Amino acid sequence: MPKKILIDFEKIKDPYSGLGQFCSHLKFYFDQSQLNLNYWIPGKWQKLAKKCHHFLPKSAVFHAVHQDSPYLPNFKKTKYILTIHDLNALYEQTQFGSGDYYKKKLQHKIDHASVITFISEFTKEEVRRHFKVDLLKTKVIYNGISLGEHSTPPPKIPTKPFLFSVGTILPKKNFHVLIDFLKQIPDYQLIVAGTTFHSYAAEMQKRIEEEGLTDRFFLVGTIDEPQKLWYYQNASAFIFPSLLEGFGLPVAEAMSLGLPLFLSDKTSLPEIGGPDAYYFKNFEPDYMRDVFLTGMQDFSIEKKNRLKERSKMFDWKQAASRYLELYENI
C-alpha cells in the first residue's frame, strides 16, 4: 500500500487569504496526483486538541504548509515537512516582548523537520539569520500566479491614468507613503485594493481627506479576482512600497501582465521583481516622483516582454510538482 501523506490544508477555509490561496492552488494540482494524499481540514472539536499529535490521523509524511501551523505529528513515526513563508510574526511579536517564545516554538519545528521549504531565497536567508538550520534539508519553492482569464469592471473606475496596488492595508505595507507621493504626480490617480479592518486604513483615509486627494486616491477595499485582473489590465503601472514580504505575490501578478513595477527595495521584493523593476531606496516624496517619472520614460516593450517571461518562474503547477516530488522521495 502506498505511503499515506497528510497535508495541513486548514487555511483553505479562508480562500481570500494568502495562505488560503496557497492551499487552494496546490490542492487543485494535488487532486490530479496518484499519490496517497490526505488533507487535514479539522472541524471545531478537533481544534480543541490541536496541540496533541495523537489527534492527527496516522501518516508516513505530514506537511505543515506554513510556519504557524499548530499541528505536529509524532516525530518518531512520521516524516515532517515544514514550509516557511516569512518571519513577520517574529518581528511583530518581538515588538510586544514575546519574540523569544515564538523563536523557541519555531526552532522546535525546524529541529524536527526532515525537509524545510521556503517561498523565497530571502526567507531562507532570514531564517538562517535567526535560527539554527541544517542547509542540507532546505529547498526554495516559489509560489505561483493564477489570475484567471476573464476580468470584470470594478465598482470604482478611475477617470485618469492610474497606478494600482493591492494588499491588506497594514502598517507593514507602507501604503501611507503613497499619499505624499501622489501629490507629486497630479496627472495620475491611485487605486489601493485590500482589506481595511486595521486602524491604519482609517488613518490613511483621514489623511487622504485632509490632503484633498479624495478624487485621486481610492482605498477600494476587498475586490474579487476578475476585478483585480481589470485593474492590472488597465493600470499605467504597479506600485508596491511594502516593508515586509516573504514573497510578494502581487508583484508577480503585475509582472505577468508586463506592467512597469515600482517597488520597495526591501526584503524579498528585489528577488521577485528582478532587474527590470524600478526600486525605491527611500520614501521621500520627491525622490519617489523622480524614480517613477524616470522609470515611466525608460520603460520599453523589451522590458515589458522580459517581465512577462520572468513571471513564468512563478507557476502553481510547477510548485505542486516539486512538493509532490518531495512527498514521493522523502
PLM regions and their residue ranges:
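Carbohydrate transferase catalytic cores enriched for Leloir-type hexosyltransferases
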Residues: 1-330
